[in-house]
């Protein structure tokens, strides 16, 4: 019986992992589809090149990428009706939450996002209620903790804003929203190993929650929003929670 129980747990775990992987692939495909509206050639479409690189890093099969490009560029089928939608709201203790989604049905997505907020002590707000608490920035991740002097020299040339040594051993470079292509291409051309790049919503200031129960509720809200099929990204101003 114990063996059967263990096997059942393995199957359940695999189903959860497969489900999350499938949802991720769906979101990545949608990002490619939207980017491909501006042209099917990634060499001349930076947004598409970014989406493809992100998808390949996550293991999205080449066939899925090709179909997403064809759908977005209108090759052989009806053009995609996906649109980018931003939602803003509050979590426990007034934590600011900014959600970006790609959807072909605004009503469905809004209902799902609203339900996730209400189930986890939050509230969906009006457009603009928390976006002023974030900066929309570019970020480029480099391999390893880079040598400071040559990196600083290159970042000054490229007009980057800052860099941060990450806990995973990489180096994250930040810049203005419009600087993404310049930073990515410039760092690559100067010999740095670029792992990935994209845009992010960076909180102007972080909010600390001392109560571990409330902090956990905030995390569950973020996880619930991230699990929605239409959601691409979830940003909050919650300070990192130190594990005991």
From Swiss-Prot:
UniProt entry keywords in alphabetical sequence: Cytoplasm, DNA-binding, Transcription, Transcription regulation
SUPFAM superfamilies referenced in this protein's UniProt entry, alphabetically: YebC-like (SSF75625)
GO cellular component: cytosol
Location of the protein in the cell: Cytoplasm
InterPro entries: Integrase-like_N, TACO1_YebC-like_2nd/3rd_dom, TACO1_YebC_N, Transcrip_reg_TACO1-like, Transcrip_reg_TACO1-like_dom3, YebC-like
Record-linked Pfam families: TACO1_YebC_N (PF20772), Transcrip_reg (PF01709)
Gene Ontology MF terms: DNA binding
Record GO biological process: regulation of DNA-templated transcription
Family membership: Belongs to the TACO1 family.
Alphabetical list of HAMAP family matching this protein: Transcrip_reg_TACO1 (MF_00693)
PANTHER family xrefs: TRANSCRIPTIONAL REGULATORY PROTEIN YEBC-RELATED (PTHR12532:SF6), TRANSLATIONAL ACTIVATOR OF CYTOCHROME C OXIDASE 1 (PTHR12532)
Protein name per Swiss-Prot or TrEMBL: Probable transcriptional regulatory protein sync_2234
Organism (species): Synechococcus sp. (strain CC9311)
